């Protein structure tokens, strides 16, 4: 039986790195990670811009970890499942905690999904292809998005707030 392989990248002390380590240990995955410095991030900007084919600062900033992640994963696999869109789909960003109610969260989720698909797919595709890696984005599948968005606002909000308190 083949062991599930997981990857994460970031900077030391990142809560995402800590969470990835915990999940890997819990699930028993073959976990690989790469911790990059600010200097390393700055040094790859020309490559990121080249592969993204844009000078858009926010897209470049968000593509830097994807670049490191694709470079790491390409040493082990040819195809990856990414988490692109999961933070948006399940209201995982901190600013969602400040929403006045579940209806506001639902409205914001609907708003951001009009633009998310193109930006996230472009970034994931171009950074993985830069390293000969294919990325699949299951959280951006229209059927997954539709199913999650049909969950009652009140129910999804209760789940969100319960999970955030863990």
Positions of the model-derived regions?
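ATP-dependent adenylate-handling active sites, centered on carboxylate activation for C-N bond formation
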Residues: 1-166
């Amino acid at each position: 039986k083949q062991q599930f392989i997981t990857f994460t990248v970031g900077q030391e002390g990142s809560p995402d790195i800590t969470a990835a380590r915990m999940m890997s240990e819990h699930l028993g995955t073959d976990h690989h990670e790469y911790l990059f410095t600010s200097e390393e991030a700055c040094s790859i900007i020309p490559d990121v811009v080249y592969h993204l084919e844009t000078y858009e600062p926010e897209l470049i900033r968000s593509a830097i970890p994807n670049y490191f992640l694709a470079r790491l994963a390409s040493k082990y696999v040819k195809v990856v499942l990414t988490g692109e869109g999961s933070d948006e789909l399940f209201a995982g960003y901190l600013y969602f905690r400040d929403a006045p109610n579940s209806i506001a969260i639902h409205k914001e989720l609907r708003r951001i999904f009009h633009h998310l698909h193109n930006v996230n797919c472009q970034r994931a595709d171009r950074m993985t292809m830069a390293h000969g890696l294919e990325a699949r984005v299951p959280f951006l599948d229209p059927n997954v998005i539709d199913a999650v968005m049909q969950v009652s606002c009140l129910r999804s909000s209760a789940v969100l707030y319960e999970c955030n308190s863990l």
